[in-house]
């Protein structure tokens, strides 16, 4: 009887594995009505979280982000886009406008979430967490945060570090 109880407790412990703090948030995908739990969808993957904007000098990074996503998603990599109007008012459109722009201009297929605030002092809980862990809050559009398969925030990258950066690519490859 005792071994049976131990096995049951072990199975229950395995099923209640905690969600990593960096993914323990829920957000609504663009134009969706129901939020998704990031942990349920992306735990165990290498995640690149990016704050985006459609009218920014860095907006062409969408192309590189999509390319990176397409090349590496089969190996457990995902890009998560979070549109924000925080910097320069460069994401003024509705969610429908954002989705149409991303799909028609850049063919974006990586997950894009609700328009949100990412700026220090106003950031949504995910970006507040990422800034607290890395010591770096977004200072402009297209800041990037890399999270490993265990949910540890590995590094923050500024807007200047593009998706085709050898440094970023090497770090992602090392985590896959």
Spans of model-derived segments:
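Structural microenvironment flanking redox-active thiols in thiol-disulfide oxidoreductases
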Residues: 58-123
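Amphipathic alpha-helical repeat scaffolds
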Residues: 51-55
């Amino acid at each position: 009887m005792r071994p049976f109880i131990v096995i049951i407790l072990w199975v229950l412990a395995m099923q209640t594995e905690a969600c990593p703090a960096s993914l323990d948030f829920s957000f609504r995908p663009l134009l969706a009505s129901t939020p998704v739990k990031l942990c349920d969808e992306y735990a165990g993957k290498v995640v690149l979280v990016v704050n985006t904007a459609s009218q920014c000098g860095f907006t062409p990074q969408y192309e590189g982000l999509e390319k990176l996503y397409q090349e590496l998603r089969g190996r457990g990599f995902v890009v998560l886009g979070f549109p924000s109007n925080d910097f320069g008012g460069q994401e003024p459109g509705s969610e429908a406008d954002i989705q149409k722009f991303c799909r028609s201009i850049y063919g974006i297929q990586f997950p894009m979430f609700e328009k949100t605030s990412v700026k220090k002092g106003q950031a949504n809980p995910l970006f507040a967490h990422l800034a607290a862990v890395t010591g770096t809050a977004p200072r402009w559009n297209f800041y990037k945060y890399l999270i490993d398969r265990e949910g540890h925030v590995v590094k923050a990258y500024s807007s200047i570090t593009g998706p085709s950066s050898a440094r970023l690519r090497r770090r992602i490859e090392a985590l896959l």
